[in-house]
């Protein structure tokens, strides 16, 4: 029995057609896709706030929606927590009353999460008497998380909860989120259009494009295929490598990535693990053999696993243990005979790398 | 002021209070329905609710009189089953005022509900609140200032009601003679113009006060709506 199974089909008046089915069995799944790919519609269908023309939804074997048999459980009885991009706290209630809202309206049997513990884990103690209008964006999002968890959900769904926050806050809220999932073991479906968020947090990713599922799998795998990346809508693939053992060395930071050495510009080693480095595909130089006598510090050895032409450029996926995307000209790709299986070295200046934590 | 004048003031307040309170539950129900509901024939409901705004009050009063008279379709039932007489009593005045003030109350309440983000109601439902619980814990509290403003508007409108009241309730000293009717009666007497002044001034003050409070509440309501 899967945790969640969904099958839905809906044709909007605008002509947009949603036709998605998938099953979830992971703790932390990300629903990924560009804007307008149908992510929010899918969440609304699962939560029960939007009823499509044809659908069936099962959660832990319980039938929530089955249009063929006229079954439709109201959102109030689905036990699915929903966190919105703009938090949607009740403006007329204090933080404390917001947190307890779900608790008061859910059957006592579902009150599996201790109020005091939520306040503790999400560090809400100092906010309880405040009203939502006196909270910052990050604080609101934390209260919204707490409110959803306290309603005792069997599934927690989040609709781009980080999209309206600035970058430094995103990492911290993600941390709270991961702490929460670890503490209460609530399966989570996380909607985002940010590849970085998917790579950092999700165990499994379902990729949507134009109302259809185009890929699913572990993040590194599912996002490595060009089709799902919806490049028409974003600036192309993002390089985000998971790094380990970051230490300060003489004049730089040293780290390991998939068993190879990595040089980073000098800075403070990150406090959290795992951490990630980000760089642009255009900053990667591809060479067929290792070259010496260059100032470039990073020489990552790997094998081409994919070549994807996009609007006058070629994106080459190199498997170095993780996927590195390089952007090269069509001439270069032809001259170097870049095809799947080719052994290459990716050359990367240390100063092109940005540490993300 | 004479004791008759004070009686008129007391009656006016009593009638206006009853009219505004009696209409409130219906105005909340219809206002919410108009703000949220999507159904065919909504325009018809709106038209009927707003009719007293555009009809001459005397015509509205006439229709009410026909319906509520002891032999009228509603009056006969009330008289026969409950032994209640509406026309030419202060209840009649209250009912006429209620009908006249109803469109104003519905309009204010409807606007207040429209200003409540429907996604907050959605959030409440995903947190386990049913339809009624969502309404009473989220929609109504968020619209409360608009509801109060609508109530005050209807109250003020009732204080000034003349045309429909005189048709349904008559102009009986001590029973249905409210401030406007008392002013009218005085003004028709040879030396009455001068004696009507205190009542006129009081009426202006009451109306201005009600309007000011209603305006203030509506402003606070708009500040309250989340960005």
Which residue ranges define each predicted feature?
Chain B
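Periplasmic/extracellular loop-to-transmembrane helix junction in inner-membrane transport proteins
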Residues: 1-19, 33-42, 79-83, 185-194
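Interhelical loop and adjacent transmembrane-helix boundary motif
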Residues: 1-7, 168-208
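C-terminal transmembrane helix and the adjacent membrane-cytosol boundary/short C-terminal tail
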Residues: 41, 103, 107-121, 125-129, ...
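Membrane-interfacial helix termini and adjacent extracytoplasmic/periplasmic loops
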Residues: 3-6, 61-98, 169-173
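Transmembrane alpha-helices
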Residues: 21, 106-109, 113, 117, ...
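Transmembrane-helix boundary motif in ABC transporter permease subunits
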Residues: 19-49, 62, 77, 112-114, ...
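Hydrophobic positions within alpha-helical transmembrane segments of bacterial inner-membrane proteins
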Residues: 20-28, 32, 58, 62, ...
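Non-cytoplasmic
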Residues: 69-70, 147-185
């Amino acid at each position: 029995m899967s945790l969640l199974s969904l099958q839905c089909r809906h044709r909007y008046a605008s002509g947009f057609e949603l036709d998605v089915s998938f099953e979830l069995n992971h703790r932390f799944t990300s629903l990924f896709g560009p804007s307008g790919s149908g992510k929010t519609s899918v969440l609304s269908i699962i939560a029960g706030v939007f009823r499509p023309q044809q659908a069936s939804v099962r959660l832990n074997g319980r039938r929530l929606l089955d249009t063929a048999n006229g079954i439709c459980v109201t959102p109030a009885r689905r036990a699915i927590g929903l966190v919105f991009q703009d938090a949607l706290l009740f403006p007329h209630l204090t933080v404390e009353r917001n947190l307890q809202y779900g608790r008061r309206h859910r059957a006592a049997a579902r009150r599996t999460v201790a109020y005091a513990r939520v306040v503790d884990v999400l560090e809400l103690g100092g906010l309880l008497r405040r009203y939502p209008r006196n909270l910052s964006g990050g604080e609101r999002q934390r209260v919204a998380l707490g409110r959803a968890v306290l309603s005792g959900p069997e599934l927690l769904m989040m609709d781009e909860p980080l999209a309206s926050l600035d970058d430094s806050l995103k990492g911290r809220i993600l941390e709270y989120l991961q702490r929460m999932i670890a503490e209460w073991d609530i399966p989570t479906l996380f909607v985002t259009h940010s590849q970085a968020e998917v790579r950092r947090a999700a165990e499994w990713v379902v990729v949507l494009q134009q109302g259809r599922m185009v890929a699913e799998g572990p993040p590194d795998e599912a996002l490595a295929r060009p089709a799902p990346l919806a490049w028409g809508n974003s600036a192309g693939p993002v390089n985000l490598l998971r790094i380990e053992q970051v230490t300060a060395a003489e004049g730089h930071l040293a780290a390991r990535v998939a068993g190879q050495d990595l040089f980073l510009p000098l800075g403070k080693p990150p406090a959290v693990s795992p951490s990630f480095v980000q760089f642009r595909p255009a900053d990667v130089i591809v060479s067929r053999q290792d070259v010496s006598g260059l100032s470039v510090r990073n020489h990552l050895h790997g094998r081409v696993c994919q070549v994807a032409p996009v609007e006058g450029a070629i994106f080459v996926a190199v498997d170095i243990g993780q996927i590195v995307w390089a952007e090269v000209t069509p001439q270069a790709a032809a001259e170097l005979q870049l095809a799947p299986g080719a052994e290459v070295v990716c050359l990367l200046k240390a100063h092109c790398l940005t540490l993300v934590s | 002021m004479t004791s008759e004048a004070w009686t008129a003031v007391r009656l006016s307040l009593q009638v206006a209070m009853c009219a505004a309170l009696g209409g409130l539950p219906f105005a909340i129900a219809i206002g919410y329905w108009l703000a949220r509901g999507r159904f065919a024939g909504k325009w018809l409901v709106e038209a009927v609710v707003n009719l007293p705004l555009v009809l001459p009050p005397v015509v509205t009063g006439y229709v009410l009189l026909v319906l509520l008279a002891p032999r009228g379709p509603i009056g006969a039932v009330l008289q026969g089953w409950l032994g209640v007489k509406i026309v030419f009593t202060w209840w009649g005045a209250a009912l006429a005022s209620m009908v006249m003030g109803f469109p104003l109350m519905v309009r204010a309440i409807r606007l207040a509900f429209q200003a409540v983000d429907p996604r907050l109601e959605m959030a409440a439902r995903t947190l386990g609140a049913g339809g009624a619980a969502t309404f009473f814990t989220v929609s109504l509290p968020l619209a409360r200032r608009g509801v109060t403003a609508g109530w005050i508007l209807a109250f003020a409108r009732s204080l000034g009601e003349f045309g429909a009241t005189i048709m349904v309730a008559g102009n009986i000293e001590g029973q249905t003679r409210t401030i406007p009717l008392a002013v009218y009666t005085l003004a028709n007497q040879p030396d009455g113009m001068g004696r009507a002044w205190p009542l006129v001034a009081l009426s202006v003050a009451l109306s201005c006060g009600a309007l000011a409070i209603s305006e203030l509440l509506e402003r606070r309501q708009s500040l309250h709506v989340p960005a």
